[in-house]
Amino acid sequence: MTDETETALPERRILCIDGGGILGTFPTAFLAGLEQHLQGQPVGSYFDLIAGTSTGGIIAIGLAMGLRASDLLDLYEKRGPEIFGRGRGRVTDFIMDRLRLGRQLVMNKHDSGPLRTALEETLGDKRIGDAATRLLIPAWNPVARSVYIYKTAHHPRLRNDYRSLAVDAALATAAAPTYFRQHVTQHAVGLTDGGTWANNPTALAVVEAITMLGWPGESLHVLSLGCLEETYTIRKWAGIGTLGSKVIKLFMDGQSHSAMGIAKLLTGHEHERTAIHRINHTVPHSAYKMDDTRVIQDLKGLGYSFARDRQPVLDPVFFSQPAEAFVPVYVLDQEPEKASTERCSV
């Protein structure tokens, strides 16, 4: 008789976090709510791979560096208003909001300086190679018209990104067009928000797990966190004037649903098992804007509420014990060509 415990595949847990500006308060609060019951362990230590785009990329990097979700929630609460130019009083905020709307017609709406300062204070001089968990952070190179994905050294081919500053990766993935200026790397590469092509990084993470890491799709468990989903309708004869901001939502929704469909097919979700747990909340159109910091407390409460509701289902799947230690192929004090490929964690 076959011993199933010997032939069972080791299960791998993946965390994916969407982009969405200040709406990232929702998934951060959700994770902070779950973290309260992990006996002091940071929530990121329970995952084998973490992927995040834009604001989700900032959260992903912080978690992979060992920060607690509650620490990152403090970042949103305390620095969010400064990053998005609010907190100066109702009258001043109202005037500045109108000025920024005008500015957005010809250039980026917000100054990226406060965001950089907040990230430098949070991440310091840590590099991607300091991550305790495998990372996947998408950005976009508009000049080369190509994807640009920051990755930890979890495969012998990944010889460069682990030396990049974590702050650079965070600024690149969060450089949302019309909101923040392009982030220029030390090698003069201009990068913009990964949300332009992978705002929901779930499919990206699943493909990485199966191809680069060699993990079978049926061994994967994915916790996918959204930054709210809007309801809206589009008329058959809609033009630019009637669509407005719905155009962006249209493309983002299409990408997200496509990503979820691909991930479900690759993991055998629904037909063979429940592989993907998607956490999101549907709200009316324009009820929550990605740079409106007045909704931070509402988002925080919503995140904690969802955590309380979903914890009984998620705990046995994701939080029974921390993930195995990640051993990168290359380390920061060792040159790639001298490093042993035997350190590969696949």
Model-assigned labels for residue ranges:
Residues 1-8, 39-44, 120-135, 211-216, ...:
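Surface-exposed acidic, glycine-flexible loop patches that form ligand/cofactor-binding
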Residues 2, 7-10, 106, 181, ...:
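C-terminal helical/tail subdomains of lipid-metabolizing enzymes
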Residues 8-16, 22-119, 154, 159, ...:
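Patatin-like phospholipase
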Residues 14-17, 46-54, 135-140, 191, ...:
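Extended hydrophobic secondary-structure segments that form protein cores and membrane-embedded regions
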Residues 130-211:
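Active-site gating loop/helix substructures
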Residues 186-188, 206-235:
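Hydrophobic, mid-to-C-terminal alpha-helical segments
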